């Protein structure tokens, strides 16, 4: 039996029995009990490999695999519970794009900056850059993925501009340092690997970064910048 088959066989045993003792009992025959007259001794002989009707499984292997399967199960449940976009009927390309990036932004594998230009509830033209991972941690996105509200830039985001009121605000976030005094335009430095994200549409976005324009009916303009950190953690 090769390693892969052995692991598969162990998984079958681990999922079939709640405890190692239950597995040992399944390997004990009525003949064993008749001659040994001691269930504990019979279990010990099975554990040592002297008795049993199947493959010998060590206690430490059983318990380690049992723990690993349980950890994986809990992680999957937590992930399903955490992903706000899961199971939603997404009606727009923009929401689909956010859903595709939600898990990786929550885990830190990816860092996305969202540019949005549109009008607010007062009819004023606004635009701004949103640190997606930070907003995911500080806000419930249920209302956005269900379509009850639109995601819009705020004065608390990494960059915000109200064109009608001529108000410009920038704020560094846990993920990005804002470089607002650059003569060639706004820059963001990703704090994890110190790489620069250039949001100028005429320039390259930077190392390990991409720029994607989203065709959407929700906004006048929507662009997503994706940055993958190469720094080892």
Curated annotation (Swiss-Prot):
Coarse class of the protein's main subcellular location: cytoplasm
One Pfam family this sequence matches: DUF4464
Localization annotation: Cytoplasm; Nucleus
Alphabetic keyword roster: Cytoplasm, Nucleus
InterPro entries, per database record: DUF4464 (IPR027887)
Keyword Lipid metabolism: no
An annotated GO cellular component: nucleus
Claim: RNA-binding is one of the keywords in the record: no
Domain of life from the UniProt record: Eukaryota
Functional summary from the UniProt entry: May be involved in spermatogenesis.
PANTHER family the record matches: CILIA- AND FLAGELLA-ASSOCIATED PROTEIN 299
Name recorded for this polypeptide: Cilia- and flagella-associated protein 299
Organism: Homo sapiens (Human)
Upper taxonomic lineage: Eukaryota, Metazoa, Chordata, Craniata, Vertebrata
